[in-house]
Amino acid sequence: MIKDMIDSIEQFAQTQADFPVYDCLGEHRTYGQLKRDSDSIAAFIDSLALLAKSPVLVFGAQTYDMLATFVALTKSGHAYIPVDVHSAPERILAIIEIAKPSLIIAIEEFPLTIEGISLVSLSEIESAKLAEMPYERTHSVKGDDNYYIIFTSGTTGQPKGVQISHDNLLSFTNWMIEDAAFDVPKQPQMLAQPPYSFDLSVMYWAPTLALGGTLFALPKELVADFKQLFTTIAQLPVGIWTSTPSFADMAMLSDDFCQAKMPALTHFYFDGEELTVSTARKLFERFPSAKIINAYGPTEATVALSAIEITREMVDNYTRLPIGYPKPDSPTYIIDEDGKELASGEQGEIIVTGPAVSKGYLNNPEKTAEAFFTFKGQPAYHTGDIGSLTEDNILLYGGRLDFQIKYAGYRIELEDVSQQLNQSPMVASAVAVPRYNKEHKVQNLLAYIVVKDGVKERFDRELELTKAIKASVKDHMMSYMMPSKFLYRDSLPLTPNGKIDIKTLINEVNNR
């Protein structure tokens, strides 16, 4: 068990100073370098005399300087707000207006001119590193202090800043490095794929730094080159893969993504969106000896609140895979619309309690009051997810409350429709979306479909293909759930975080 994240990093700087903490295509930085650089940057930040404990926005990609700056800010007592280089200027501006950071550190060129907030460039960070200033930690982030603030997309389009404290982070990290499901080895070799602005990134950097391992990052230029990306990943000595299931589906389009080409890769950690039976089955085919860990949890509960190892038996027997056993320190409950706790097997809203629950949204008391509350004397959060608990305390996922629609008199869960379509042997990926009329009532249900290789060639017309797909799933799907129209695509759009961008597809069919 670790008691302080920075203490852990400092310990490895002493015991394994020359061991790589960060590797980007063979160019690496060591734990000793990380300590020296973060000390120097922390001293530089202190010299700016910022308001104590004020948040600092850090703009950039998955570079070493981003990591060193995060560690430095923690040492100097400031929460960091990671903003990815691919963020739209409008979103960056919205984050700044909400967070009111005391400083902006631009590891990459900053796309906006902001009045009233000082901006530190990469050249200034480099100069600070060269100064090699010693640093004594007297006011570092601890306890209930904010460690990082990650902005998620709000339902109104206005981003919300989730405040994660040092205590929140320790709750998650200690669970992950000690829980048998994750089976994290000492000195883990982890692929650093999700951007730092996505809290799934915490699932790779937190256990890696806590256990003295190495992060294998990819330059942003490579990430944009799909073919070269997965050819390169296959050459990396990573043992643990952390991503959304959608990113793994993309990886499996490359023949190099298999156990024969990547023998060191033994663990897959998934979070951020639902892991489907189809994706898990394909992974077992590609990596017969690998462990697949399905984790679940919102950003507001610090990355994940439950996890479970997915077995072949689960793949064969479940239509929707279980999302795990709740963390021991984070009791998870199912409640009805009146807030009453439901019994095992009953479906309702998933709520999480305990020390990993965020204190709320930064500078947004109204939204905080809506989502955060107290349950059985513990801080609690409304996930907005539908689920149930088995008698063995395994959490089952039933979709999003806000993805439920009323159609033809029936209440339909969109994710359930997508799941059923994904069961077709002809379908690689499917997403169900509603089309609304002028009264904003559901007019009909459509589905975006990506078929497996070679499927289209077997049919002369799309109509015949559609009939075949419908026939392949009709025995498991209620007729009122069947989409009236299939829209075929070569790929589905992804968000910057690697999730299928359902909102974009809904807007597309409704001409928004």
Swiss-Prot record:
Catalysed conversion reaction: holo-[D-alanyl-carrier protein] + D-alanine + ATP = D-alanyl-[D-alanyl-carrier protein] + AMP + diphosphate
PROSITE patterns, A to Z: AMP_BINDING
Top-level taxon: Bacteria
One Gene Ontology term of the molecular function aspect: ATP binding
Described purpose of this protein according to its UniProt entry: Catalyzes the first step in the D-alanylation of lipoteichoic acid (LTA), the activation of D-alanine and its transfer onto the D-alanyl carrier protein (Dcp) DltC. In an ATP-dependent two-step reaction, forms a high energy D-alanyl-AMP intermediate, followed by transfer of the D-alanyl residue as a thiol ester to the phosphopantheinyl prosthetic group of the Dcp. D-alanylation of LTA plays an important role in modulating the properties of the cell wall in Gram-positive bacteria, influencing the net charge of the cell wall.
Cellular component aspect of the GO annotation: cytoplasm
Keyword list, A-Z: ATP-binding, Cytoplasm, Ligase, Nucleotide-binding
Residues the record lists as binding D-alanine: 199, 303, 499
Family membership noted in the UniProt record: Belongs to the ATP-dependent AMP-binding enzyme family. DltA subfamily.
Chain's gene name: dltA
Organism (species): Streptococcus pyogenes serotype M28 (strain MGAS6180)
Pathway annotation from the record: Cell wall biogenesis; lipoteichoic acid biosynthesis
Record's subcellular location: Cytoplasm
Protein name as catalogued: D-alanine--D-alanyl carrier protein ligase
EC number(s) given by UniProt: 6.2.1.54
Residue numbers binding ATP: 152-153, 294-299, 385, 397-400, 499
